[in-house]
Amino acid sequence: MSNEFGTVSIEPEVVSTYAGSVAVECFGIVGMAAVNVKDGLVKLLKKDYLHHGISVSITDNKITLDFHVIISYGVNIEAVADNLIHTVKYKVESFTGMQIEKINIFVEGVRVID
């Protein structure tokens, strides 16, 4: 982003950290998942590492987000994904001033919540 005073550069990790904190507040999202590609293992990330479950690409001030999530057992996946997309889109666009071009959601696991 540029204006008459200079340029503002936002690192992808800043966007992923913010998007992760927004995502875990959404209904049905238990947390973000770290996928070990070599072993095919999925593990639930602790709050300090949420950004590891999100891939961010910024091109021409447009953001693409890939979420790897773990959802609650018994929820409607489509409803959870729709809520996640709309909530993250609104909050990240407000936070960064950039447009969200695409949000991809990968459901990596299901957890039973007590």
What are these regions (language model features)?
Residues 1-73, 82, 94, 99-114:
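Contiguous, often N-terminal, cationic amphipathic patches that form binding interfaces
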Residues 77-79:
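Solvent-exposed, non-transmembrane alpha-helical starts
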